[in-house]
């Protein structure tokens, strides 16, 4: 039996070639886990003769799945790689749900509600005037129950208090309402696929379809996802799970790092292989990371090591306040940039909470440092995209009341509040969807003539788009729809600033282009399938990693990334670790979050904290984080004790570099 042709270390090679049963790969930060998954797929297909169509690799983000597909195509060739299922958990759940929708009580053309739409449904089901924060909390609780694989019919087992009991009663109404809309939320993609797999015939069908399963970022799985994997892997455990218990930082959204141990309990024959050689960071960074995370309990110990040399000492910088901290970071970036230590894109500034970014942005702008702030408004949350997506959702699923209400009078077509109220009343009386009510002459007969005519034209347009989108070219149907509603003219009326208008028009063009690309990938699919795929996406190709800019992002957002130079701001008590997490007993997860931040650095790492920070309009004294005490003193280089002199040097250094920039640009 031949072995993988690409160069692997001994532990990676063992993980790739092991097929004797279920396997857990404990892959430390920067140890090449994605490489192992790619090479194992190649090994299974080319060396073990398993058809690519029988192999599935599951990850958490569209970006990771896309990267995996591209790397597989480079190793297997496009034709073989296309046969392999590479998807997110939610995409896989969508495949199962769509294949067995009748068994689960759904009709064709299921809509997938995003977070905003789902929250709107919850708001409408709660008493009028319910505070927005209560709506958000109720929706979050429903999500937690679903992530724990609790269905609305489970006899209130999820409720732990009187408040939760009320939300549990809401759960059944919410589930019924979504079923009437022929819609699901993102959590349902896992929960409903679990329901389908309870059927033995369905389960056997999928176990035959997926003969080997590989799972990335396994430590981030929640209860529902774990059960899904168990059902697909079967009793013999045709599974390789790759994860790192030290990087489990999503407990707040249901992730259970204990799922690593549960694998051993459920599969006594489980093989465990550790990947401990780090290919990213220098030795000093790894020694600090190892020392920090050693304060957390471990079922299986591992210590990262590197052959890249020691690198720079870790700098710890006390600052007077957050403004001095931001100025210091900006000045240090300028210094490294202009002494040949790297380009703008080699620097990242990480922090615990989004609220820390404002003062950092200001400092970078003052020094004319180009930067990119991660975590802005999602493409699909933009008004123009939500409008057009709702038109298309309604075209493939006329039961989607949420979509109907958003677009029936957008752009304005003389269907006012009173007319919409009449349609809603008629729909409620006859227990039908809003769109079906709008198509009925008896409903429209009571409306003003102009409103009735507009509503009839609207319904005809939606029906025609749905029909053409399935029978003919779906992209032409989409373009004709957008032209027919004169959406571009509507945007021009609604948008005052030319720059903003052009951005919104470009977003519309990008949406059509994205649909075109999806259609070209699978030419035989109609609009219903295209919409299902599009609804699962969270970002577009145009949201590529920014080049040539300093990156500002939260610690959570930095996971999976690496940078030559990393600044970790706000390493203070009540911030890192966060006060709320300490109150909830989550100190270990906060330590893992710090560990993730440290291990993003390749060559240099700077940790900073403020001695006071402005909170709620007042200056509050801050203490250095307890995590600093857990780092070996010999690895740290503390900046001088005289803060005022240090801050003066910081300002002077920044001023010198700014003058250089002015000279460079001829100012």
Language-model segments: which ranges?
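N-terminal pre-P-loop "Q-motif" helix
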Residues: 4-20, 224
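A basic/glycine-biased coupling hinge at the interface between accessory DNA-binding modules
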Residues: 2-3, 20-23, 41-211, 237, ...
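Short glycine-/polar-rich loops that comprise or flank the Walker A/P-loop
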Residues: 21, 50-54, 81-83, 117-118, ...
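Conserved helicase motor core of SF1/SF2 NTP-dependent helicases
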Residues: 31-34, 219-298, 302-307, 425, ...
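Conserved Walker B
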Residues: 29, 210-221, 225, 245-246, ...
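Conserved helicase C-terminal RecA-like lobe
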Residues: 160, 212, 343, 357-369, ...
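Acidic, low-complexity intrinsically disordered tails
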Residues: 1, 635-667
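Helicase P-loop NTPase motor core
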Residues: 25, 29-37, 41, 52, ...
């Amino acid at each position: 039996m031949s072995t993988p042709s690409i160069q692997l270390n001994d532990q990676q090679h063992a993980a790739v070639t092991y097929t004797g049963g279920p396997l857990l790969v404990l892959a430390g930060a920067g140890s090449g886990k994605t490489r192992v998954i790619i090479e194992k797929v190649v090994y299974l297909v080319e060396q073990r003769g398993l058809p690519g169509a029988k192999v599935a690799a599951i990850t958490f983000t569209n970006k990771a799945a896309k990267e995996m597909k591209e790397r597989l195509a480079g190793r297997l060739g496009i034709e073989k790689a296309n046969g392999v299922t590479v998807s997110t958990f939610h995409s896989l759940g969508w495949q199962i749900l769509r294949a067995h929708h009748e068994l689960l009580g759904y009709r064709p053309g299921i809509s997938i509600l995003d977070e905003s739409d789902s929250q709107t449904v919850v708001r409408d089901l709660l008493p009028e005037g319910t505070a927005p924060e209560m709506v958000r909390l109720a929706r979050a609780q429903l999500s937690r129950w679903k992530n724990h694989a609790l269905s609305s019919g489970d006899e209130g087992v999820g409720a732990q208090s009187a408040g939760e009991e009320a939300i549990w009663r809401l759960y059944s109404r919410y589930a019924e309402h979504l079923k009437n809309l022929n819609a699901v939320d993102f959590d349902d993609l896992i929960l409903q696929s679990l329901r389908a797999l309870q059927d033995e015939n369905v389960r056997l069908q999928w176990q035959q379809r997926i003969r080997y399963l590989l799972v990335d970022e396994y430590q981030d799985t929640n209860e529902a996802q774990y059960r899904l994997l168990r059902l697909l892997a079967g009793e013999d455990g045709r599974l390789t799970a790759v994860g790192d218990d030290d990087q489990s930082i999503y407990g707040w959204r249901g992730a259970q790092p204990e799922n690593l141990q549960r694998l051993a309990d459920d599969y006594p024959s489980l093989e465990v292989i550790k990947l401990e050689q780090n290919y990213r960071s220098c030795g000093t960074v790894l020694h600090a990371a190892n020392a920090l995370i050693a304060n957390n309990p471990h079922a299986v110990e591992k210590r990262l090591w590197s052959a890249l040399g020691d690198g720079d000492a870790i700098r710890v910088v006390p600052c007077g306040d957050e403004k001095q901290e931001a100025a210091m970071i900006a000045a240090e970036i300028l210094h490294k940039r202009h002494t040949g230590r790297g380009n703008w894109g080699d620097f990242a500034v990480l922090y615990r909470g989004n609220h820390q970014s404002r003062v950092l942005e200001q400092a970078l702008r003052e020094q004319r440092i180009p930067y990119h702030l991660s975590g802005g408004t999602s493409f699909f949350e933009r008004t123009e995209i939500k409008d057009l997506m709702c038109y298309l959702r309604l075209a493939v699923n006329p039961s989607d009341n949420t979509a109907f209400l958003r677009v029936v009078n957008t752009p304005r077509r003389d269907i006012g509040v009173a007319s919409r109220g009449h349609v809603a009343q008629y729909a409620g009386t006859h227990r039908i969807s809003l769109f079906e009510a709008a198509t009925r002459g008896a409903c429209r007969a009571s409306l003003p003539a102009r409103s009735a005519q507009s509503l009839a034209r609207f319904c005809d347009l939606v029906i025609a788009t749905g029909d053409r989108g399935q029978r003919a070219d779906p992209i032409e149907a989409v373009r004709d729809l957008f032209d027919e509603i004169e959406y571009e003219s509507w945007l021009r009326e609604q948008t005052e600033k030319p720059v903003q208008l052009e951005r919104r028009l470009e977003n519309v063009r990008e949406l059509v282009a994205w649909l075109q690309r999806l259609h070209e990938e699978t030419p035989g699919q109609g609009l219903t399938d295209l919409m299902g795929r599009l609804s699962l996406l969270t970002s577009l190709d145009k949201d590529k990693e920014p080049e040539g800019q300093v990156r500002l992002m939260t610690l959570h957002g930095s996971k999976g990334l690496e940078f030559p130079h990393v600044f970790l701001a706000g390493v203070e008590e009540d911030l890192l670790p966060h006060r709320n997490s300490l109150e909830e007993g989550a100190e270990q997860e906060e330590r893992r979050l710090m560990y993730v931040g440290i291990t993003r650095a390749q060559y240099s790492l700077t940790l900073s904290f403020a001695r006071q920070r402005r909170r709620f309009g007042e200056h509050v004294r801050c203490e250095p984080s307890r995590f600093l005490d857990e780092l070996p003193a010999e690895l740290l280089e503390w900046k001088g004790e005289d803060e005022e002199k240090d801050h003066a040097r910081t300002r002077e250094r920044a001023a010198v570099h700014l003058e250089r920039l002015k000279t460079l640009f001829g100012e």
